[in-house]
């Protein structure tokens, strides 16, 4: 069981550290509001991580093979990512004032993180691969206890990363110039728009 738990920790860190939509939104909000909004985005994303993990481990991910499920979910994902991308470009053009905008950033940061994570069906592809990896670790079909240990290890690593990522973004906010903030906002906006385009391309 220890080997399963440690493997899940490593896979979880690999999943969370890779840049993507959640990190981009964490950076955008954290540069304005600091640690709390950045942390809330990360914590919100745990909802989606947990849902996709359970779907992947239980085999319910097969539902995404149906066009009636996959297409609306992908369209919603693309639309939301595009909207966030436009917000990022807007912030690059006219950076928000931290004192005025921090409260607004904090209020909906948790929901933004959850929405990004829940609306991204590509997460289940990763979990399909992890399911195969888990089967290799246990040398067969994992039982319920083994799956739960793997899930717990993954979620623990995700929770640890939430605080590490938020602290990093807050440090960047305090120790970098406004020019760097604007470049970061623009980069996040372009990345989010690119991810929206990739989502549509997969239809």
Swiss-Prot record:
Organism superkingdom: Bacteria
Main subcellular location: membrane
Localization of this protein: Cell membrane
Pfam families: LysE (PF01810)
Record keywords: Cell membrane, Membrane, Transmembrane, Transmembrane helix
Family that this chain belongs to: Belongs to the Rht family.
Protein's recorded name: Chemotactic transduction protein ChpE
Native source organism of the sequence: Pseudomonas aeruginosa (strain ATCC 15692 / DSM 22644 / CIP 104116 / JCM 14847 / LMG 12228 / 1C / PRS 101 / PAO1)
